[in-house]
UniProtKB/Swiss-Prot annotation:
InterPro entries, A to Z: Com_YlbF, YheA/YmcA-like_dom_sf
Residues spanning the membrane: none
Similarity remark: Belongs to the UPF0342 family.
Matching SUPFAM superfamilies: YheA/YmcA-like
Secretion signal, residue range per the UniProt entry: none
Lineage per the UniProt record: Bacteria, Bacillati, Bacillota, Bacilli, Lactobacillales
Organism: Streptococcus agalactiae serotype III (strain NEM316)
Coiled-coil stretches noted in the UniProt entry, renumbered to this chain: none
Protein's name in the database: UPF0342 protein gbs1446
One Pfam family it belongs to: Com_YlbF
Source domain of life: Bacteria
Length: 111
């Protein structure tokens, strides 16, 4: 029987080798090399963190915060580097979702 940890490490290497993963890495590097994209990226991460904290504490963003997030979303959509990043990230997430279903299938059997 194969060692489960060896299989998990092999899966990690396989994910890193996916063209979709490599595309996300390339897109991320492009963002890091562009000052405007990097500022928008940092703004996005801060907004995402703020929303997650609010939701975890049972709060909803105010209308003003929602408007700010919409404006940030529009800025992100208009930035080609960030748009490419999120497009590649979406493609990679399809793989990750499929892998998650496969890996957690045995846990579903126990429910």
């Amino acid at each position: 029987m194969a060692n489960v940890y060896d299989l998990a490490n092999e899966l990690e290497r396989a994910v890193r080798a996916l063209p979709e993963y490599q595309a996300v890495l390339t897109a991320k590097a492009a963002i890091e090399n562009d000052a405007d994209a990097q500022v928008l990226w940092q703004d996005f991460l801060a907004a995402q963190s703020k929303v997650q904290e609010m939701m975890q504490s049972g709060q909803m963003p105010s209308q003003e915060e929602q408007d700010e997030m919409s404006k940030l979303g529009e800025k992100i959509e208009s930035n080609d580097l960030l748009k490419v990043y999120f497009d590649h990230q979406q493609r990679l997430s399809v793989y990750m979702s499929d892998i998650e279903k496969i890996v957690f299938a045995p846990m579903q059997d126990l429910m």
